[in-house]
């Protein structure tokens, strides 16, 4: 079995995960969950997202490479989230550029992020 790629998270990816947590927490509160329950549920969901993100390194070349976004970028959906990443075969690394959740227009979000200069390092 091949060695998994090291998974690196961009600053934007970390911000995405924080925003997902905030969104989930507020949604659970709006639906009537007590604060502690909403925190617990949001944290559990985000742990699942982070686990799926880490597992991307096990199969780094999954998903299509849309030619009109950024060379080498791959969007991969998992359990309600879409992960955008670039795998570097030479370094055996996978850089996660973004994580979008739910019904977001993730394609337009990643295009705006790239055009704003966030690029692969952002």
Task: Identify the meaning behind each predicted range.
Residues 29, 54, 58-61, 81, ...:
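Generic structural signal for secondary-structure transition and capping sites
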Residues 21-24, 60, 110:
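Short, flexible helix/strand-to-coil boundary loops that buttress conserved ligand/catalytic motifs
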Residues 13, 49, 85:
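GIY-YIG nuclease signature motif recognition
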Residues 73-76, 81-122:
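Enriched for short, Lys/Arg-rich terminal
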Residues 1-46, 122:
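Arg/Lys-rich, positively charged N-terminal/basic patches that mediate binding to nucleic acids
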Residues 21, 50-53, 100:
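Conserved protein kinase catalytic domain
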């Amino acid at each position: 079995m091949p060695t998994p790629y090291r998974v690196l998270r961009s600053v934007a990816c970390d911000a995405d995960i924080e925003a997902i947590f905030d969104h989930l927490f507020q949604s659970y509160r709006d639906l009537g969950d007590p604060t502690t329950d909403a925190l617990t549920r949001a944290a559990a969901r985000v742990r699942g997202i982070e686990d799926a993100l880490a597992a991307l390194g096990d199969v780094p070349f999954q998903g299509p490479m849309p030619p009109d976004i950024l060379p080498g970028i791959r969007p991969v959906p998992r359990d309600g989230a879409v992960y955008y990443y670039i795998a570097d075969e030479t370094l055996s690394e996978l850089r996660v550029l973004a994580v979008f959740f739910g019904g977001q227009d993730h394609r337009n979000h990643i295009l705006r992020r790239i055009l704003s200069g966030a690029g692969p390092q952002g």
